[in-house]
């Protein structure tokens, strides 16, 4: 299966945005975008001025990389979002936020979405009491996500939970750290997303 092979730090520098792809490192002075706030490459310090299409494309690429998706996956989410009731941009972001790997990340069981995706694939979580190992599994409001009993001593999970207060838990999620369990209480609102995303640019790009 195809996947991103570029350094996470290079991705953040290319997008000129701290996307917290390296977990704890992003909160320290070792963060690459803090030390070198310009694109990677020989001519990185001279940023290119994009056309209207270029701005739309960069926004799509940024969100794809933020959630770790490939083009076919992302386009599929857009088509489902445009077919649903409501604003296409809001629908798109809600679908991305309610992916199981993202929910695991938001609950604080992993430092990054990429790590959350690996943990899900390795069968460390159960959804409403049933083990699920599909990162794209769509979580619904009222759903409980729990670390399986034998995985509660996994160092990556316990260490991530120790620093969850620094990262914060969104309002649409409740977390019981002692029980290694979280619940999606409602559908996330646009206001719950703190990352600077201009979803309308993505809608305009795909609408052409």
Curated annotation (Swiss-Prot):
InterPro entries referenced in this protein's UniProt entry, alphabetically: Ribosomal_uS4, Ribosomal_uS4_bac-type, Ribosomal_uS4_CS, Ribosomal_uS4_N, S4_RNA-bd, S4_RNA-bd_sf
Keyword Ribosomal protein: yes
SUPFAM superfamilies listed in its UniProt record: Alpha-L RNA-binding motif (SSF55174)
BP GO annotations: ribosomal small subunit biogenesis; translation
Disulfides per UniProt: none
SMART domains assigned: Ribosomal_S4 (SM01390), S4 (SM00363)
One Gene Ontology cellular component: small ribosomal subunit
GO molecular function, one term: rRNA binding
Binding partners and assembly: Part of the 30S ribosomal subunit. Contacts protein S5. The interaction surface between S4 and S5 is involved in control of translational fidelity.
Known role: One of the primary rRNA binding proteins, it binds directly to 16S rRNA where it nucleates assembly of the body of the 30S subunit.
Protein name: Small ribosomal subunit protein uS4A
Gene source species: Myxococcus xanthus (strain DK1622)
Lineage per the UniProt record: Bacteria, Pseudomonadati, Myxococcota, Myxococcia, Myxococcales
Gene: rpsD1
